[in-house]
Amino acid sequence: MSMFCYQCQETAGCKGCTVKGVCGKDESVAKAQDLLIYVTKGLAVVSNEGMKVGVKDSKVNKYIVENLFTTITNANFDRDSILDRVRETLRIREDLKAKVVKAGGKVGEVKVSGGFFKKLFGIAKEEMVGPDAATWTADNVIEFDAKAEKVGVLSTENEDIRSLRELITYGLKGLSAYMKHAMNLKYDDETVHEFMAKALAATLDDSLSVDQLVALALEAGKFGVNGMALLDKANTETYGNPEITTVDIGVRKNPGILISGHDLRDLEMLLEQTEGTGVDVYTHGEMLAGQYYPKFKKYKNFAGNYGNAWWKQKEEFEKFNGPIVMTTNCIVIPKASYKNRLFTTGATGMPGCPHIEAKADGTKDFSEVIKMAKKCSAPTEIEKGQIVGGFAHNQVIALADKVVAAVKSGAIKRFFVMAGCDGRANSRNYYTEFAEKLPKDTVILTAGCAKYKYNKLNLGDIGGIPRVLDAGQCNDSYSLVVIALKLQEVFRLKSVNELPISYNIAWYEQKAVIVLLSLLHLGVKNIHLGPTLPAFLSPNVAKVLVDNFGIGGITNVEDDMKMFMQG
């Protein structure tokens, strides 16, 4: 069986990648990821059973989170490291299974079948109780490859069951990213891990109906909110509340290190280790949000933001001249001209690129990156100017009186939530045109790399309130929810859907999936997704979302604008 992957928006023909991923992963990597997800579900089954008999293990939680994160689009292209995780997952599963059985649990228990006389004459058959994912084991690549052929997405034959299982799995992948970042800052929530194990195990349960899986997907949204709230708490208590910040997009004269991705702990360690070295640190992509946190502003070598969204990195990384640190997705297969300057860490991986491992205490040594930077030229300037951001919930609520007054006076007629992701497709230019053509009495609320489609346009302000309010990274979509709920409270409305807010969201990968499920859990309706609806939504599952939540796609700027402005 050839590879099959349809987890991202750019999947081939909006149906599925079957020869090579549009992301760049080949068939061997795709199948290694399939196998890793399969054995992770098996580990979740054992973990779920363990909870029933009081057996819990934080190491298991951590590994489930990291495995899921590793398979997010554009995170890890290193087949060997993925298969190493498969081996370690099997080992951890068997260790946990022994503890569960000792405590009275049933999973993985050996049962002898065949009747009394077959047992007597030694010809009975031994069988393992539990899903195959919880009992299958192997120790070599040949067996891994053979198993991977059988456990991919298409191994679930029923289209609707498959769709819902993948919707849940992709939501959990997104949630895993947020949990991992929070855990890196020593914040955690056991209830989220318990749900993740339960939900992963449920995707192996053939007895569950479509209705039960729909309910589970919405429950994933509940824990998505909890996960984003936890990460918001971790980030703000560690680094302070984001504040209105003007960020340079030009360059300085010193050599630099470019840090991309989402992990603020990695950013902190890099700033600590580069201080006083003569090496500047620039943010890239969604790491732009690091510029908004007060704690990072004390570092004099913390320069501005270099470049744009992830998909432009081949051109921009080449011109940066110095080393690049990828803390999370999104990585694009690098050009030879800068591949030796690309470092991965955390869940990321790229064959031929050095990987920086965390020590037992979670710290990382960036000395090799700094050493390389000192030998490199300063970044080539690709643009000049400044952008403004830092409008997370605490900052916007501090401006609440001003915002409310603008709404009451009619100066602000409508808010547009245009959070989400950017991508390669030309069809995404829709979002630039949409932002440009919005009436001057509207305000864009954004988070994630979707902002790069319009955050450098001169869209002006309304009474001193910028018309683009950037809350930060994709996880900071939580801030947009908090802002909406606060406005609902201020205006004394029964539902958040009564607010003059429209949702025109660009999605790309699995973190956007958990954001969507979180919004649905909160009761937000009439969300429009683009540039295409997810390929993993079967017609019947899509109909459920349309009928119950008003989910829709996009068409063209003119028609969509009229539809949104009508409320």
UniProtKB/Swiss-Prot annotation:
CC cofactor: [4Fe-4S] cluster; hybrid [4Fe-2O-2S] cluster
Catalytic class of the enzyme: oxidoreductase
Sites of Cysteine persulfide modification: C421
Catalyzed reactions per annotation: A + NH4(+) + H2O = hydroxylamine + AH2 + H(+)
Domain of life: Bacteria
Residues that coordinate or bind hybrid [4Fe-2O-2S] cluster: H262, E286, C330, C421, C449, C474, E509, K511
Keyword Oxidoreductase: yes
Entry GO CC: cytoplasm
Name by which UniProt lists this protein: Hydroxylamine reductase 2
Organism: Clostridium acetobutylicum (strain ATCC 824 / DSM 792 / JCM 1419 / IAM 19013 / LMG 5710 / NBRC 13948 / NRRL B-527 / VKM B-1787 / 2291 / W)
